[in-house]
Amino acid sequence: MSTTAMWLLLAVVIVVILFGSVLYKRTFTTKELALTGVMAALSLVAYLFFRVPFYGGSSFHLGNTFTALTALLLDGVSGGLAGAIGLALADILAGDPGYAVTTFVLKFIIGITCGAVAHKVFKLRELDKHAPGYLAKVIVAAASGLLLNVFTDPFLGYFRNVYIFGQEYTIAKALTKITGGVTFVNSVASTVCVVLLYLALRPALERANRPPKAQKASEPKADK
């Protein structure tokens, strides 16, 4: 596939996902947009400057951490967009627009999955941090999307290698197996980081969103 076709495909993928996001989540607050942007930037930095590359285009990095973390702190759409935008842009800056196509889809899937498990299944926002099983639910919610990526990454990677990069079937199949192993290590390490960061950041975020207490009006002094 030509470079122009890669860019067009990436543009189509972005438009479709953004359109679906708007339909699902019609409004974003200023705080949500700001936090999503910060997490996208952290994803980009974690990938571009703190990664260990492996043969076949895969690499060890913690960029997915901020995708899942945003999904747990906010919601699945915000998490998916943070990871999709940040890590797809990282691929582009690294000179890999072909990888950016599948990256955008894969990271959005991570965010949506983590958000669905955290807020639809476990309803983490409504749980007290001292509730029985709270830590286990946080771990499962974080791991859900990240471990799903262990399977979706090689699957989409196969089609990317064959239909975008034009590689032979046997080569693409071998590369997806290598990617699957590295992705599993990424997922486990990212899950640990997400859980630790979420437990630390959730109380601070709740305090920031809590309306200030109304000050009691001073009682009028009695006339002498």
PLM segments and residue spans:
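Loop-helix junctions at membrane interfaces
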Residues: 1-224
